[in-house]
């Protein structure tokens, strides 16, 4: 490996064209030759990537070139900067250029400010304790009336202030409190029942005077909260009623659970019955004189018609068989009503209790009731 030492002032060649502001040397006044600030190194071809004879010019900027009057004229060299020298850059492949570009973009887009909720903050054991401390300082509602002490009660007065304890202690205490109760009461109690039982265990025994007050707010709240459990039907309400105090009154809606098993159907609505249209009366048949005379003659001979006789009479008079049949029935009813005599067979059946077709008529003029 061949090195060319060009650092000595006597052997160094001129560094080439120099651009930039460099103070002119004092060639005439003083015989002063400053030390060169460039080092040129020649590398063999086995270490090169690009051209076979590649020369890398390594610039080592030192302090500005000294001068005899440096101590006096130090302010003149404040604007001194390294002269611009054309450097030979090595050749990179496309993959390397792409990698360098992606790395520069990633460094440019990397956020400098820390994220408030990063993974490190979340995994920290103190994460979330500030929220607990803030919520523990929230004040309850202000007292409004004399029954404030009865209506309002904090969640748990027995628990001390949790802000002075560590995270491990709070976690162990939370697990112990959760293990004290079965999950949801072993699926046999509702949430309201569990809360009622816990409040009953923690509360001191009430005085007799407070128990005698029927209008106390505590009894109202307890009855309302316990009454909210009975929404599954009248059978559940009756079972709860038997388990609780016999003198306790339940709200009326507890017993009104007729449609609880099928809530989608809803209450049944009674349809309004439409008024039936009046039956169209059959138009009265207008018989001619000849037809009436022939019908009266046949009725005088025999009050009852056979089927063959009725058919022949209908064909002779040009009437329907039903018209002739109805005329004979009406004629017999008029005679029976006018005479007032009963058929002896009908009287015998009525005596045996097998026949009773007595009709009650009320006359408009005399308003008397006649039983026929």
UniProtKB/Swiss-Prot annotation:
Transmembrane segments: none
Tissue: Expressed in the middle silk gland but not in the posterior silk gland during the fourth molt/fifth intermolt period.
Gene3D superfamilies assigned to the protein according to its UniProt record, in alphabetical order: Homeodomain-like
CDD domains (UniProt xref): homeodomain
Stretches the record annotates as Disordered: 1-35, 47-112, 196-246, 261-286
DNA-binding region: 280-339
Compositionally skewed regions (Low complexity) per UniProt: 216-244
Domain of life of the source: Eukaryota
GO (cellular component) term, any one: nucleus
Subcellular location: Nucleus
Keywords, ordered alphabetically: Developmental protein, DNA-binding, Homeobox, Nucleus, Segmentation polarity protein
InterPro entries named in the record: Engrailed_Homeobox_TFs, HD, HD_engrailed, HD_metazoa, Homeobox-engrailed_C-terminal, Homeobox-engrailed_CS, Homeobox_CS, Homeodomain-like_sf
PROSITE patterns: ENGRAILED (PS00033), HOMEOBOX_1 (PS00027), HOMEOBOX_2 (PS50071)
Positions with biased composition (Basic and acidic residues): 79-105, 197-215
Gene Ontology molecular function: DNA-binding transcription factor activity, RNA polymerase II-specific; RNA polymerase II cis-regulatory region sequence-specific DNA binding
GO biological processes: neuron differentiation; segment polarity determination
Its job: This protein might be involved in the compartmentalization of the silk gland.
Similarity annotation: Belongs to the engrailed homeobox family.
Protein name per Swiss-Prot or TrEMBL: Segmentation polarity homeobox protein engrailed
Organism classification: Eukaryota, Metazoa, Ecdysozoa, Arthropoda, Hexapoda
Gene: en
């Amino acid at each position: 490996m061949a090195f060319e030492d060009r650092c000595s002032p006597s052997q160094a060649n001129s560094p080439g064209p120099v651009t930039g502001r460099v103070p002119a040397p004092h060639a005439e006044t003083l015989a002063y030759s400053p030390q060169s600030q460039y080092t040129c190194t020649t590398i063999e071809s086995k270490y090169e990537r690009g051209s076979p004879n590649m020369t890398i010019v390594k610039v080592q900027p030192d302090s500005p070139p000294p001068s005899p009057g440096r101590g006096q004229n130090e302010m003149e060299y404040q604007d001194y900067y390294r002269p611009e020298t054309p450097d030979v850059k090595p050749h990179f492949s496309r993959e390397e250029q792409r990698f360098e570009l992606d790395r520069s973009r990633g460094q440019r887009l990397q956020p400098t400010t820390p994220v408030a909720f990063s993974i490190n903050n979340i995994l920290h054991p103190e994460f979330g304790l500030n929220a607990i401390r803030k919520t523990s300082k929230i004040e309850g509602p202000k007292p409004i009336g004399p029954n404030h002490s009865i209506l309002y009660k904090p969640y748990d007065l027995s628990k001390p202030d949790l802000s002075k304890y560590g995270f491990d202690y709070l976690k162990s205490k939370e697990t112990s409190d959760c293990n004290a109760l079965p999950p949801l009461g072993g699926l046999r109690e509702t949430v309201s029942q569990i809360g009622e039982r816990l409040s009953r265990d923690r509360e001191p025994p009430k005085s007799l005077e407070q128990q005698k007050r029927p209008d106390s707010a505590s009894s109202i709240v307890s009855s309302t909260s316990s009454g909210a459990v009975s929404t599954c039907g009248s059978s559940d309400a009756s079972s709860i009623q038997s388990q609780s105090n016999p003198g306790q009154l339940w709200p009326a809606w507890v017993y009104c659970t007729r449609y609880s098993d099928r809530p989608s159907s809803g209450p049944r609505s009674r349809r309004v019955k439409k008024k039936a249209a009046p039956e169209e009366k059959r138009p009265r048949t207008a018989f001619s004189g000849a037809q009436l005379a022939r019908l009266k003659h046949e009725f005088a001979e025999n009050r009852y018609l056979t089927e063959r006789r009725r058919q022949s009479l209908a064909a002779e008079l040009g009437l329907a068989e039903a018209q002739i049949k109805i005329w004979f029935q009406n004629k017999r009813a008029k005679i029976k009503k006018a005479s007032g005599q009963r058929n002896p067979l009908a009287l015998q059946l009525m005596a045996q209790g097998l026949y009773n077709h007595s009709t009650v008529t009320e006359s408009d003029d005399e308003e008397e009731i006649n039983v026929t």
